[in-house]
Amino acid sequence: MKNISDYRNKKVLVLGLAKSGVNAARLLHKLGALVTVNDKQQFDDNKDAQELLADGMRVITGRHPVELLDEHFELMVKNPGIPYSNPMVKRAEALHMPIITEPELAYQVSEAQWIGITGTNGKTTTTTLIGLMLNQQRPHHAFDAGNIGIPVSQVAQKVGKDDTIVAELSSFQLCGIKTLHPHIAVLTNIYEAHLDWHGNRANYVAAKMRITMNQTPDDYFIMNWDLPEMHELAKQSKAQIVPFSRKNAEGARAQLIDGWLTFDGDRIMKASEMQIPGLHNIENALAAIAAVKLEGVGDDAIREVLRTFSGVKHRIQYLETIDGRRVYNDSKATNVEAATVALNAFDQPIVWLAGGLDRGLPMDALTPLVKKHVKSMVVFGQTAPLMAKIGKDAGVPVQTTENVMTAVPLAYEVSRPGDVILLSPAAASWDQYPNFEVRGDDFIKAVNQLKATVESGDK
């Protein structure tokens, strides 16, 4: 690590825990900082706070007391989810206290090269592909981190100058960077998202563009050239622009041409050979190809990854082929938009498993997609009546069941070889499950049980 002495005896307030806050606090403590941790959750229910206290850090829980800032902290490391409208953050700004998020801290002490990935959709898949391709070429030297679920401050402690941190960076995280400077930055796309947090679209776009703010003409900024907005945004960057395009946009270096994934006009592989389905994943693959080509990765490594990578867990993740039916887990699809992407990803007839928490949102936009792509539906959860109506309006058979586990055998019964069985709930999981991951894990269990039953000859 570098810049270790910068933190020795420095008074630092870590505001908000969760994974990023805990790891930031531990790193700062290791560097010799005088760490105070403040988290809203009560101490008795706060395992993270209890562990940090046992490690020798000062811990204040139960609320965010603004008067705490009278203690003259020299730095605040803010949990990315806490908005800048929070009274503690506003007071810190009034005191001209530096406020950063955990990736900035990690960058300041890390000796590794950085590749940063942001965007509304596709961040996690693109990050994962880049890491896999780099490690396929040169094993054990690329490390995925950030919004993907592994705090960057955890990774920063174990990497060296010859390594690469491949960091997924959310708009929330990017708002709190100061010096973070990825050699390669990727902006997958920009759509409407998180406007409640950012206040308006302009602020959201500005947050995303912070990924390139410290880049120089020696760096690269990979952008989606199929979106006209990107052409204007590119003018804000000092880096070399490396466009990618699925639609043959002029000037793109990574492109889909006549069904081939290409870079600088050279064919790498047919898009149809990719394990992960969908036009959106072609875009993710092109962004990843652009990034790793700039790092000197060969075509063989790229092909190996794209032919074998079955998807990020719970995101149109290929699970199994059971008696000719391909099964996909898209439990992450917690809204209509995400389910739309999944339904559009397949040319084969779909048996669709859907349902979950009823947020009172309109779902009518799914009806024409069901009519076009779906042969049968199995619905569950609070939104089961809504989903059943969509199926009825589309002229598709619908079965209602209790949950994901009971839906899987029903889906198999109405499917035929050549079909796709797809869990893409179009709803949050909280009516029956603590999160979409648990829902997806239940689906995986049910699919494994079904496979065992079918292969034993009981079905």
From Swiss-Prot:
Alphabetically, which GO biological process terms does the record hold?
cell division; cell wall organization; peptidoglycan biosynthetic process; regulation of cell shape
Report the coiled-coil segments. none
Query: Per the UniProt record, which EC number(s) apply here?
Result: 6.3.2.9
InterPro entries listed in its UniProt record = Mur-like_cat_sf, Mur_ligase_C, Mur_ligase_C_dom_sf, Mur_ligase_cen, MurD
The answer, when asked if Hydrolase is one of the entry's keywords, is no
Q: Where in the cell is it found?
A: Cytoplasm
Q: Name one GO cellular component term.
A: cytoplasm
Instruction: Return the NCBIfam families for the record.
Output: murD
| The name this protein goes by in its record | UDP-N-acetylmuramoylalanine--D-glutamate ligase
Q: Which organism is it from?
A: Lacticaseibacillus casei (strain BL23) (Lactobacillus casei)
| Gene giving rise to this polypeptide | murD
